[in-house]
C-alpha cells in the first residue's frame, strides 16, 4: 500500500505558484489528445522513416568472404567487449577472470546500499557513487585501450 503525500493548499508559496498558473495544464495544452495522437506518431514514424531511408541509401558493405583456413593472428572482439577481453587475456587463471567479470555488476549493485544514508540527487554530493563511477570509467577505458595492444605492452599501455 503506497502512501501519497498531498500538497498543503494553505502554503502561501504554493498558492502563489498556483495563482500564476502552475499546476494542472501548466504548459497550456493537454497531453491527450494533442501529444499522444499527433506528436508521438509523427516522431515515431519520422524516426522509422529516417532509419529505412538510411538503410536503403547506404546498405551495409560486406567485406571479403571469410576464409576458415586463413585466420588472423589475433582476433579482437567488438569494441564494447574490449575491457572484458583484456581481463580474460591478462589474468592467467580463467576462473579468476570470470569471477572478476561477475564482480563488476555485483560491486555496482552494492553502491546504492553503501550510500543509502545520503539522500541527495546531485552527483557531486554523493562521493561514494561519484568515486565508483570515475574509477570504473578510468579502469574500463584503460582495459579497453590495452586490449587493442599486443599482450606485452597491454598492461602498461607502453608508458613504462
UniProtKB/Swiss-Prot annotation:
Any Pfam family: Cytochrom_B_C
GO cellular component, one term: chloroplast thylakoid membrane
Claim: Chloroplast is one of the keywords in the record: yes
SUPFAM superfamilies hit by this protein: a domain/subunit of cytochrome bc1 complex (Ubiquinol-cytochrome c reductase)
Protein's cellular compartments: Plastid, Chloroplast thylakoid membrane
Keyword hit for Transport: yes
Complex formation: The 4 large subunits of the cytochrome b6-f complex are cytochrome b6, subunit IV (17 kDa polypeptide, petD), cytochrome f and the Rieske protein, while the 4 small subunits are petG, petL, petM and petN. The complex functions as a dimer.
Protein name: Cytochrome b6-f complex subunit 4
Organism this protein belongs to: Mesostigma viride
Gene this chain is encoded by: petD
Amino acid at each position: 500500500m503506497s502512501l501519497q503525500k498531498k500538497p498543503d493548499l494553505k502554503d502561501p508559496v504554493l498558492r502563489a505558484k498556483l495563482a500564476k498558473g502552475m499546476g494542472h495544464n501548466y504548459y497550456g495544452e493537454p497531453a491527450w489528445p494533442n501529444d499522444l495522437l499527433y506528436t508521438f506518431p509523427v516522431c515515431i514514424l519520422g524516426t522509422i522513416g529516417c532509419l529505412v531511408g538510411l538503410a536503403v541509401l547506404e546498405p551495409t558493405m560486406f567485406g571479403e568472404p571469410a576464409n576458415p583456413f586463413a585466420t588472423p593472428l589475433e582476433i579482437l572482439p567488438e569494441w564494447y567487449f574490449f575491457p572484458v577481453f583484456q581481463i580474460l587475456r591478462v589474468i592467467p587463471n580463467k576462473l579468476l577472470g570470470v569471477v572478476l567479470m561477475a564482480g563488476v555488476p555485483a560491486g555496482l549493485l552494492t553502491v546504492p546500499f553503501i550510500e543509502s544514508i545520503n539522500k541527495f540527487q546531485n552527483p557531486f554530493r554523493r562521493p561514494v557513487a561519484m568515486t565508483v563511477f570515475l574509477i570504473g570509467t578510468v579502469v574500463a577505458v584503460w582495459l579497453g585501450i590495452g586490449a587493442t595492444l599486443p599482450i606485452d605492452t597491454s598492461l602498461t599501455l607502453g608508458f613504462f
